[in-house]
Amino acid sequence: MARFRTVPVCAAALMAFACSSAFAADPAACRSVRFADVGWTDIAATTGLASTILAGLGYAPTTTLASVPITFAGLKSKQIDVFLGYWSPTMDPIIEPFVKAGTIKVLNTPNLTGAKYTLAVPDYVYQGGLHSFQDIAKYADKLQGRIYGIEPGNDGNALIQKMIGANQFDLGKFKLVESSEAGMLVQVNRAIREKQWIVFLGWEPHPMNVQMKIDYLTGGDAVFGPNYGEARVLTAVPPDYSARCPNVAKFVSNLQFTTSIENHLMVPIMNKEDPQKAAAAWLKGNPQMLDKWLAGVTTFDGKPGAPAVRAYLGAQ
């Protein structure tokens, strides 16, 4: 797809130079870039990075907090432009009807690989004998018959509820406790302080992996997928977004993160720092990432992107 328009003929005196001024700007309607955030710190981090860079390019990014189902409905209705948090395979059953109907497009390249998403326990619970999904029911009393999830409508919660409903691993009498990422982590931290037993939905990247001593349970391949629910995180957009807003689409297709980047960037966000402020500070310390993420990307008005973002960050 075309990312820029070149002038058919450059003046002879300028032929030795790149015709950078020939880049075409996105249409005016593309200046507003509407992201969705489903309330997870990793998505707040990546959305904060993308929004900070887009602001430096002269765009006007905004973020809407919404559940996963509402986010996908927003992409379908074109009220949301970009969602950086499609975790595959756990979200596959939720998004597949939209993709098959042609109302959502998933970009080809994941923005994160090597993620994990499955049930976890504090280290002392693991050392006490709870190593796998098959062990959970044996410790029902210590666990008070509860598995802690995050927000209602979340894909991980749905997998846990399906497991309970089917009485997999003899968990039919267990209860899924839904709240939010923050609410679940409050419960986990309280349990750790009091050395109580708890099993909860864990994932990486997330600061929980460096701030708490936790272990992931084995044996959950049939529920969360192999290798501790190994996941890819992908970017979803409306089906015609790349044609309507090619410059922004090129930018978000360039975005590739690592678990290390996200683990570290999430720490200040967990400490209540604004995601875009945290992103700006991280980008100042890691400016080399801009060259990769802004390859082939211009400012909103068609100028070279990377110099503009560096200047923007320098003024922060």
Task: For every predicted segment, state its role.
Residues 23-34, 138-144, 293, 312-316:
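Immediate post-signal peptide segment of exported/extracytoplasmic ligand-binding proteins
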Residues 27-42, 59-64, 144-148, 252:
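Short, well-ordered beta-strand elements
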Residues 31, 41-42, 162-193, 199, ...:
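An extracytoplasmic/periplasmic, membrane-proximal ligand-sensing/linker region
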Residues 47, 64-102, 183-187, 207-212:
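Pocket-flanking alpha-helical
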Residues 50-58, 140-174, 284:
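Ligand-binding cleft/hinge of the Venus flytrap
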Residues 80-85, 152-221:
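Ligand-binding pocket segment of bilobal, Venus flytrap-like solute-binding proteins
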Residues 103-152:
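A conserved helix-loop-strand patch within extracytoplasmic ligand-binding domains
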Residues 116-126, 230-244, 267-268:
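A bilobed periplasmic-binding-protein/Venus flytrap-type ligand-binding module shared by bacterial periplasmic
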